[in-house]
Amino acid sequence: MIDTKHLDVAVQDLRNVLRDGLIATDIWDRTDGLSLAGFNAQPVAVALFTRITTELESSMADSNFPPLARYYLIDLAGNHTAAVLNHGSLLQGMLVDNKRANLGILISVAIPRMIDAIAKAR
Protein backbone atom coordinates (compact mmCIF):
# COMPACT_ATOMS: atom_id res chain seq x y z
CA MET A 1 0.00 0.00 0.00
CA ILE A 2 1.30 3.43 -0.93
CA ASP A 3 1.19 6.16 1.71
CA THR A 4 -0.02 9.16 -0.32
CA LYS A 5 0.87 11.55 2.52
CA HIS A 6 4.51 10.55 2.04
CA LEU A 7 4.11 11.18 -1.69
CA ASP A 8 2.72 14.66 -1.01
CA VAL A 9 5.69 15.42 1.27
CA ALA A 10 8.07 14.15 -1.42
CA VAL A 11 6.47 16.42 -4.03
CA GLN A 12 6.80 19.41 -1.69
CA ASP A 13 10.46 18.54 -1.11
CA LEU A 14 10.98 18.38 -4.88
CA ARG A 15 9.40 21.82 -5.23
CA ASN A 16 11.76 23.13 -2.53
CA VAL A 17 14.81 21.69 -4.31
CA LEU A 18 13.96 22.79 -7.86
CA ARG A 19 12.01 25.92 -6.86
CA ASP A 20 10.50 27.76 -9.81
CA GLY A 21 12.39 25.47 -12.20
CA LEU A 22 9.84 22.72 -11.57
CA ILE A 23 6.95 23.31 -13.95
CA ALA A 24 5.03 20.12 -13.19
CA THR A 25 5.32 16.67 -11.65
CA ASP A 26 3.00 13.70 -11.28
CA ILE A 27 3.44 10.36 -9.52
CA TRP A 28 1.07 7.75 -10.89
CA ASP A 29 0.18 4.08 -10.94
CA ARG A 30 1.49 2.77 -14.23
CA THR A 31 -1.31 0.18 -14.54
CA ASP A 32 -4.33 2.47 -14.40
CA GLY A 33 -2.73 5.89 -14.91
CA LEU A 34 -4.18 7.19 -11.65
CA SER A 35 -2.19 10.17 -10.36
CA LEU A 36 -1.47 9.74 -6.66
CA ALA A 37 0.34 13.02 -6.04
CA GLY A 38 1.61 15.94 -8.02
CA PHE A 39 2.08 19.61 -8.68
CA ASN A 40 0.42 21.29 -11.67
CA ALA A 41 -0.99 17.88 -12.70
CA GLN A 42 -0.76 16.93 -16.37
CA PRO A 43 -3.12 13.98 -17.10
CA VAL A 44 -2.32 13.96 -20.83
CA ALA A 45 1.40 13.76 -20.05
CA VAL A 46 0.70 10.88 -17.63
CA ALA A 47 -0.92 8.90 -20.45
CA LEU A 48 1.84 9.86 -22.89
CA PHE A 49 4.73 8.89 -20.63
CA THR A 50 3.07 5.64 -19.58
CA ARG A 51 2.84 4.69 -23.25
CA ILE A 52 6.38 5.88 -24.07
CA THR A 53 7.83 3.98 -21.10
CA THR A 54 5.99 0.78 -22.01
CA GLU A 55 7.14 1.02 -25.65
CA LEU A 56 10.70 1.86 -24.62
CA GLU A 57 10.86 -1.11 -22.23
CA SER A 58 9.47 -3.45 -24.89
CA SER A 59 11.79 -2.17 -27.62
CA MET A 60 14.84 -2.41 -25.39
CA ALA A 61 13.98 -5.99 -24.45
CA ASP A 62 13.41 -6.89 -28.12
CA SER A 63 16.81 -5.37 -28.95
CA ASN A 64 18.56 -7.29 -26.15
CA PHE A 65 19.46 -4.04 -24.40
CA PRO A 66 19.62 -3.88 -20.61
CA PRO A 67 16.28 -2.83 -19.08
CA LEU A 68 15.50 0.69 -17.94
CA ALA A 69 16.85 1.43 -14.51
CA ARG A 70 15.89 4.45 -12.40
CA TYR A 71 15.05 7.18 -14.92
CA TYR A 72 15.37 8.62 -18.40
CA LEU A 73 15.58 12.21 -19.61
CA ILE A 74 14.20 13.89 -22.73
CA ASP A 75 15.68 17.17 -23.94
CA LEU A 76 12.81 19.38 -25.12
CA ALA A 77 12.57 22.59 -27.10
CA GLY A 78 12.46 25.87 -25.25
CA ASN A 79 15.24 24.83 -22.84
CA HIS A 80 13.07 22.27 -21.00
CA THR A 81 13.74 18.73 -19.82
CA ALA A 82 11.29 15.93 -19.13
CA ALA A 83 12.42 13.35 -16.60
CA VAL A 84 10.59 10.06 -16.13
CA LEU A 85 11.41 8.10 -12.98
CA ASN A 86 10.79 4.38 -12.74
CA HIS A 87 9.54 3.44 -9.28
CA GLY A 88 8.42 -0.08 -10.28
CA SER A 89 4.63 -0.09 -10.19
CA LEU A 90 4.68 3.72 -10.08
CA LEU A 91 6.04 6.20 -12.59
CA GLN A 92 6.86 9.85 -12.06
CA GLY A 93 7.17 12.58 -14.63
CA MET A 94 8.78 15.97 -14.17
CA LEU A 95 8.86 18.95 -16.50
CA VAL A 96 11.79 21.22 -15.68
CA ASP A 97 12.72 24.67 -16.98
CA ASN A 98 16.48 24.47 -17.54
CA LYS A 99 16.83 28.26 -17.27
CA ARG A 100 15.55 28.16 -13.71
CA ALA A 101 16.77 24.79 -12.43
CA ASN A 102 20.29 23.42 -12.66
CA LEU A 103 20.36 20.00 -14.37
CA GLY A 104 23.18 18.94 -12.06
CA ILE A 105 20.85 19.48 -9.09
CA LEU A 106 18.09 17.58 -10.90
CA ILE A 107 20.30 14.55 -11.54
CA SER A 108 22.43 14.52 -8.39
CA VAL A 109 19.94 15.74 -5.77
CA ALA A 110 16.29 15.87 -6.88
CA ILE A 111 16.04 12.50 -8.65
CA PRO A 112 17.86 10.47 -5.96
CA ARG A 113 15.77 12.11 -3.22
CA MET A 114 12.55 11.29 -5.07
CA ILE A 115 13.63 7.68 -5.58
CA ASP A 116 14.35 7.34 -1.84
CA ALA A 117 11.12 9.10 -0.83
CA ILE A 118 8.93 6.90 -3.03
CA ALA A 119 10.63 3.78 -1.68
CA LYS A 120 9.82 4.95 1.87
CA ALA A 121 6.17 5.59 0.93
CA ARG A 122 5.65 1.90 0.19
Task: Annotate each predicted stretch with a short phrase.
Residues M1-R122:
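Non-catalytic interaction/Regulatory regions outside core domains
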